[in-house]
Amino acid sequence: MGRDTIADIITSIRNAHMDKKGTVRIASTNMTENIVRILLREGFIENVRKHRENQKNFLVSTLRHRRNRKGTSRTILNLKRISRPGLRIYSNYQKIPRILGGMGIVILSTSRGVMTDREARLEGIGGEILCYIW
């Protein structure tokens, strides 16, 4: 039985966010790099760097926190895995769901790579719905 690396990323980020940790260490694969790149571009994480330890590559990402007078407070971050190895969920570009009326994002795996729902609608392609982030 294989590992679900996307669920591992989502769980790691969610746990670090709930525990108010600043950084998350994620195993590096092509899929995880693409998802983290989207999270970085959309502003859900602050910084990403590659780290090599014992012949294995990792991504160390810094979570984004707001600063206010009382100190740092965390931004509201919710992640939900949709398509999973036991039940794949596909959608064409017209039926890609909108999260919170467009405030959240949907990450899709398409024939042209991993992209957000906005990019998929602009290009007119659908794909496998990996996760929701809001």
Curated annotation (Swiss-Prot):
InterPro entries, alphabetized: Ribosomal_uS8 (IPR000630), Ribosomal_uS8_CS (IPR047863), Ribosomal_uS8_sf (IPR035987)
Subcellular location: Plastid, Chloroplast
Example of a GO biological process term: translation
Keywords: Chloroplast, Plastid, Ribonucleoprotein, Ribosomal protein, RNA-binding, rRNA-binding
GO molecular function: rRNA binding; structural constituent of ribosome
Pfam families with a match to the protein in the record: Ribosomal_S8
Gene Ontology CC: one annotated term: ribonucleoprotein complex
Assembly notes: Part of the 30S ribosomal subunit.
Family per record: Belongs to the universal ribosomal protein uS8 family.
HAMAP family referenced in this protein's UniProt entry, alphabetically: Ribosomal_uS8_B
General function of this protein: One of the primary rRNA binding proteins, it binds directly to 16S rRNA central domain where it helps coordinate assembly of the platform of the 30S subunit.
Protein's name in the database: Small ribosomal subunit protein uS8c
Organism per entry: Piper cenocladum
